[in-house]
């Protein structure tokens, strides 16, 4: 225990001493109110002051710095510390309260005689703290025990020693100085605003309805922290039973409770003891349970009535109807109940006959000699190597699997024994000498070759699926739907058209002939008076073989002519070429305009544009056209601009066409345009007959285009004729 607690406990006991008549009053009356308790707590403080004044002259050795506890402050703090003391005090039992009150009355009676003893003991030195604690511990069980204490107990002596250690209370000097400074005024005013919902009056009506509804609101859990005492448990159990007259023990318990409350009110301000653990409380409560309380409780209960015995004759056995098990046949359990679509059909041959089940081949029992031969095959190296030749070729990359392959080749039926023997042989190869192995191999006989070893493994599973050839749609004409069949080409009358005649291809032309035809423009023959008909044919051949665009007018010199013999050969080749070509027949549909076979649904509507006719010109702009007609200068022509003006050399080239140089001629010679009118007309006709020239749709535009082509083709034809 702390020394402060040791000091506080005896002080409270001393206060209880001189007020014994008050305790007797409590036995007769009910518990008094709080103001009466306060008045009682102030009286012992006055007595304590008188005692301390008597002890003062005898105390010389104590220093002034000792802790002092004024009685005034103790009396003020007493009502505040009631709650603390009640929680820390041990709940007393019913029996222990009676002797306590008696002992306290005796202590209070002997309190007067204890005062001179305190003065005598003050001269001696104060006892040690350890002694005080021992005295206090010995005093606590004295309170709980109902034994009668002596005239002057150890508690009184401890209190006397404790009082001697206390000094006088310090006198507090009141400050009488007056404030002479300026007056302090607080202009700020505070207004109290009550919070919403702090009281029930401030709650809105809608929220009150929600609070009244207790649906879904979990209530607070019951307080299980407070253990019920034996008296509370007895009262709770006996509340259901009604008694005619209350027992004498009930009156005593009420008086004891009133005295306990009065004692707690007086000693609450000073006692600060720790509460005992729960285990000790339970033990004390169990000890305090007496036989008298149990007897009183059992007396309130009535006698137990005996239960009537049951007669076995009155019991009747109930007969349950026995359920009969009926076996219901399920669908598919018998072959008759299986639908015909789902019945298993027996396997049949191609002819439709059912196949007979194959007889299982039973393995022949091996004799002891055969078993020994099979087991000893792995030890014979010569036989093992012969059979190992094939698998070793496959497993050259994996050397670790060679002994297993040997074991597979040697063993035919007993795979397990062979595998064990192969592992044993592979491990014992390095340990067993060669002589022993050879001696063992000589004792073994030779194994006959099995004819089935070299045969490939056949699959025993026979598949029922058969391949059926089905004709695909469109594979034959009969399988093609009538909508998708190809229709024969027919005339307008509905007659089938005859097959088109295949045109005979032109004879293959040699490279020499093509080169001569292409280089004809660069060379001039000796005989310039060649017939016009041959030139026309040659131009047609060249235009068909080579591209239809005119050759560029290059100023490259032709190959030098060695002799007149070459000219004769060229003439002969041209004559042969012209003879091979027949006369061209005129096509009646040649000059007809080309018609579009695609018929467009969109019709082109001709709309007059603004200014296309005189009627569509606005009146504001008509005077401009009138001025131009009268002779006002219009827009300058494109040819008059300096940008588009051509040089005199270019104009001269346009006017006079040039002919290529020949070996006989040293310079370019100008050929007049109207030198050979017949030859030029033939050339223009041949140019117009070429397939590249497209006839325009409009007739007026076609005439203009033909005129322009004739003008451009005239100078080119003149140049070719001269060559």
UniProtKB/Swiss-Prot annotation:
Composition bias, Polar residues: 653-670
Skewed-composition ranges (Low complexity): 85-94, 113-125, 548-560, 672-690
Cross-link annotation Glycyl lysine isopeptide (Lys-Gly) (interchain with G-Cter in SUMO2), location: 32
Name of the protein in question: Calpastatin
Biased composition (Basic and acidic residues): 46-84, 195-216, 249-263, 306-367, 378-396, 445-504, 562-571, 586-643, 701-723
Source species of the chain: Ovis aries (Sheep)
Gene Ontology terms for molecular function: calcium-dependent cysteine-type endopeptidase inhibitor activity
Residues modified to N6-acetyllysine: 50
Residue list for modification Phosphothreonine: 137
Annotated function: Specific inhibition of calpain (calcium-dependent cysteine protease). Plays a key role in postmortem tenderization of meat and have been proposed to be involved in muscle protein degradation in living tissue.
Modification Phosphoserine occurs at: 87, 224, 245, 367, 369, 376, 443, 519, 530, 578, 580
Alphabetic keyword roster: Acetylation, Isopeptide bond, Phosphoprotein, Protease inhibitor, Repeat, Thiol protease inhibitor, Ubl conjugation
Biased composition (Basic residues): 21-30
Free-text comment on this protein's domains from its UniProt entry: Each of the four flexible inhibitory domains can inhibit one calcium-bound calpain molecule by occupying both sides of the active site.
Pfam families on file: Calpain_inhib (PF00748)
Disulfide bonds: none
Tree of life domain: Eukaryota
Biased composition (Acidic residues): 157-173
């Amino acid at each position: 225990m702390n020394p402060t607690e040791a000091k506080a406990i005896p002080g409270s006991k001393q206060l209880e001493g001189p007020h014994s008549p008050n305790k007797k009053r409590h036995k007769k009356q009910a518990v008094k109110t709080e103001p009466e308790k306060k008045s009682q707590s102030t009286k012992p403080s006055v007595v304590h002051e008188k005692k301390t004044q008597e002890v003062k002259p005898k105390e010389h050795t104590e220093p002034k710095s000792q802790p002092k506890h004024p009685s005034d402050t103790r009396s003020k703090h007493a009502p505040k510390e009631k709650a603390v003391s009640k929680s820390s005090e041990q709940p007393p039992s019913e029996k222990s309260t009676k002797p306590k009150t008696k002992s306290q009355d005796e202590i209070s009676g002997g309190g007067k005689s204890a005062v001179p003893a305190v003065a005598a003991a003050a001269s001696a030195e104060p006892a040690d703290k350890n002694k005080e604690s021992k005295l206090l511990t010995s005093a606590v069980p004295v309170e709980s025990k109902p034994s009668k204490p002596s005239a002057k107990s150890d508690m009184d002596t401890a209190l006397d020693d404790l009082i001697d250690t206390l000094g006088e209370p310090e006198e507090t000097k009141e400050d009488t100085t007056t404030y002479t400074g300026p007056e302090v005024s607080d202009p700020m005013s505070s207004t109290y605003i009550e919070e919403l919902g702090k009281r029930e009056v401030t709650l809105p009506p809608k929220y009150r309805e929600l609070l009244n509804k207790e649906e879904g609101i979990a209530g607070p859990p019951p307080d299980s922290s407070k253990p019920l005492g034996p008296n509370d448990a007895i009262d709770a159990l006996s509340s259901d039973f009604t008694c005619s007259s209350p027992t004498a023990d009930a009156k005593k318990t009420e008086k004891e409770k009133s005295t306990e409350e009065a004692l707690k009110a007086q000693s609450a301000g000073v006692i600060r003891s720790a509460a005992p653990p729960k285990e000790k409380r339970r033990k004390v409560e169990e000890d305090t349970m007496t036989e008298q309380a149990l007897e009183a409780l059992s007396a309130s209960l009535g006698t137990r009535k005996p239960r009537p015995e049951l007669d076995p004759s009155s019991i009747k056995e109930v007969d349950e109807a026995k359920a009969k098990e009926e076996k219901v046949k399920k669908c598919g359990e018998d072959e008759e109940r299986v639908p015909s679509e789902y019945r298993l059909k027996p396997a049949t041959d191609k002819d439709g006959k059912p196949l007979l089940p194959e007889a299982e081949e039973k393995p022949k029992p091996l004799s002891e000699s055969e078993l020994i031969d099979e087991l000893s095959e792995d030890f014979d190296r010569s036989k093992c190597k012969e059979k190992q030749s094939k698998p070793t070729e496959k497993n050259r990359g994996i050397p670790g699997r060679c002994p297993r392959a040997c074991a597979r080749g040697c063993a035919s039926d007993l795979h397990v024994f062979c595998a064990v023997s192969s592992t044993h042989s592979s491990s014992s190869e390095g340990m067993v000498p060669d002589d022993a192995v050879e001696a063992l191999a000589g004792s073994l006989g030779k194994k006959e070759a099995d004819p089935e070893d070299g045969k490939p493994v056949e699959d025993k599973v026979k598949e029922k699926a058969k391949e059926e050839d089905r004709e695909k749609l469109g594979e034959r004409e009969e399988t093609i739907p009538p909508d998708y069949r190809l229709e024969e080409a027919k005339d307008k009358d509905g007659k089938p058209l005859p097959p088109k005649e295949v045109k005979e291809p032109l004879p293959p032309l040699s490279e020499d002939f093509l080169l001569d035809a292409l280089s004809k423009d660069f060379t001039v023959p000796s005989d310039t008076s060649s017939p016009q008909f041959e030139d026309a044919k040659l131009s047609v051949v060249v235009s068909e073989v080579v591209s239809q665009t005119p050759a560029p007018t290059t100023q490259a010199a032709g190959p030098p002519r060695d002799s007149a013999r070459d000219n004769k050969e060229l003439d002969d080749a041209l004559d042969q070429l012209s003879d091979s070509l027949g006369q061209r027949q005129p096509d009646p549909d040649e000059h007809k305009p080309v018609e579009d076979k695609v018929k467009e649904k969109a019709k082109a509507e001709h709309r007059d544009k603004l200014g296309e006719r005189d009627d569509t010109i606005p009146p504001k702009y008509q005077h401009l056209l009138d001025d131009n007609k009268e002779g006002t200068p219009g827009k300058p022509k494109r040819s008059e601009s300096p940008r588009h003006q051509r040089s005199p050399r270019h104009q001269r080239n346009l006017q006079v066409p040039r002919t290529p140089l020949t070996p006989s001629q040293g310079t370019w010679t100008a050929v007049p345009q109207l030198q050979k009118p017949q030859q030029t007309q033939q050339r223009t006709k041949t140019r117009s007959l070429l397939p590249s020239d497209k006839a325009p749709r409009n007739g007026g535009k076609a005439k203009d285009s033909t005129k322009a082509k004739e003008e451009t083709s005239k100078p080119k034809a003149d140049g070719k004729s001269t060559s």
